[in-house]
Amino acid sequence: MMGLRDQVVAGLLICLGAMLTACGGSSSSGQTTTANDTGSAETRAWQPYERPQEFSAMVTLPREFIEMRDGVRLSAHITLPADEVGNPVETPLPVILTQTGYNSSTGGVTAANPYFVQRGYAQVYVDVRGTGNSEGVWEAWGPVEQADYLEVMDWVAKQPWSDGNVGTWGPSFMAITQLLTAQHNHPAHKALFAIVPPGDVYRDITFAGGQINGAFVPAWLGLVTGLSLIPAQESFQDPEQLLSVFAEHTANAVTEFQATTLIGGLTGSDETAYDSEFWRVRSPLTHIDKVKVPTFVVGGLRDIFQRSEPMAYEGLKDNTNAKLLIGPWDHLQGSQLEGLPVDGIPHGDDIALAWFDHYLKGMNNGAEDMPAVTQYIYGEERYVTLPDWPHPQLQSERWYLRGDGSLSQQGAAADEGSEIVLQQPFAGICSDSTAQWSAGILGLLPSPCYDDNRINETLEVTYTSAPMEEDYFINGPIQADLWISTTALDAGVVVRVSDVSPDGVSRQLTSGLLTASARAVDPNQSRYVAGNMIQPWHLYTADSRQPLAMNEVVAINVEIFSTSAVIKRGHALRISVGASDFPRGIPPVLDLVDQLAGVMTVYSDADRPSSVVLPVIPIEALPPVASGE
């Protein structure tokens, strides 16, 4: 049987091929983060959790259709526990609901989880409007689809097999539907378990840095489209409905949403190429402070939603019981919480089961007291539990990009030189970004580029610290404050943060991307630590664009997504600056023309001191390795 990762990879590759042949809000980061020198917040430890199954079998009922307010019908598959001969139990049960765009009739990522069902849960998968075998037009988390979420919740809570307590579960697409549902606090919605969820659809992935993601977005649109054209077995009993849905989904893809949205982004459409209401309404961080439903967030250090996962927790924690678990995962790995159990953390299914057992079944199992924050720490190569995110003892330190290629906490001298970078549109392909921003798919192919950034660094300028004399702990967002100019009319700027081992291997920890003309920042929505801006909030609107003149020197603030790492004693910290992160970032056509054939200069003198602001935690705040690990 194919595992979840295999199902996702196969689906993406098949649908990408089909696509290529067939198709010719405000964030919670707007605040000042202050340091807490006491570090008094309690840090809890993980406890094991297992519960024996209650039922030996399960059964999936015949497909049902849920009629929406406008007559559109959504396809639903319901799986219930069963007795030894396959009869569904008659006792009403708590329900685990998943609303998906990946066709609930295909199995794989949309198959019921026996672990939950056999422990006394009904599990329901619903194809959102215009996807799978549901009728209607898909609009990817738009207002109409969001209204459907609540109607589905109403329907599920009232069914005879439901006891009215509903939890939501699932990765990626199936995680964003949870967060968008939870902002309405439906009375039946008692808990959610959001695995690798998007938070800000524009800034996270689709247009990070003002450039469209060419590694993931086209393949993802193709995946949803391709899976929407696969009929459920039951559909052959109603050929008229089958053909109607097939025609509707095809027209939707070509003329109404998928193709038009992608083309609009590439051509610079005001609605999709900029951070408009189109994106804000689809981004859970816009209204994350409204959520009162207990929420468990799972993220990945190399996930495509790396930026927003800790920010979602941050926006939730003051209004509900929220937990955060971040692993060393790309999107595919994080979708299945790969590698657990480890370091005292239970298996992913056991964590979710404990969460639902407490909030849906009322079991006094201590789930509410799980560790608030659990993070994997690069360099330590282990998970640790921490009191909060951002860490209560967070400080900021500024390191300067020196003219001699060094990285130092000492400011630049007046006569220090500058460095140049050729603006090549395909630079970055030999870096870990290619694996990360393809959701981990391209990372399955063997390449030396993913574990060592030195090949890619030949196309960038690098600034490297002296070997660390003591372990150096960073945890949080990073900001690069650069002074640049270009001989072209615009520039793409990528900044990478790497750990350089004594043998010279350069391991990329995280990165950030920005189109220079999109450099306008709203200081009121940006994050500050100890007086330093550490996470800029770029406006990304058409009106806020700041065109460059040839050879004009400008200051830009590049947002580098959060990471957690210890640069070990004897290792060095490296910042590299380049002009492209292909295929993660592809500028809209007109921006690309403005950037071609340019030479970008990075300045390092006292009047134009390029630097990075790092999120530093005292190494003493890092929990020690537990005995026996």
Q: What function would you assign to each model-found segment?
A:
Residues 85-158, 206-208, 336-340, 501-502, ...:
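Cap/lid segment of the alpha/beta-hydrolase catalytic domain
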Residues 341-629:
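C-terminal, loop-rich substrate-recognition/catalytic regions characterized by aromatic stacking residues
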Residues 19-22:
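C-terminal motif of bacterial Sec signal peptides marking the signal peptidase cleavage site
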Residues 291, 297-299:
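Short beta-strand/loop motif that positions the catalytic acidic residue
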Residues 48-91, 464, 468-470:
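N-terminal cap/lid segment of alpha/beta-hydrolase-fold proteins
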Residues 160-173:
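Alpha/beta-hydrolase fold nucleophile elbow
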Residues 307-322:
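Active-site-adjacent alpha-helix of alpha/beta-hydrolase-fold enzymes
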Residues 118, 182-290:
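Accessory cap/linker subdomain of secreted extracellular hydrolases
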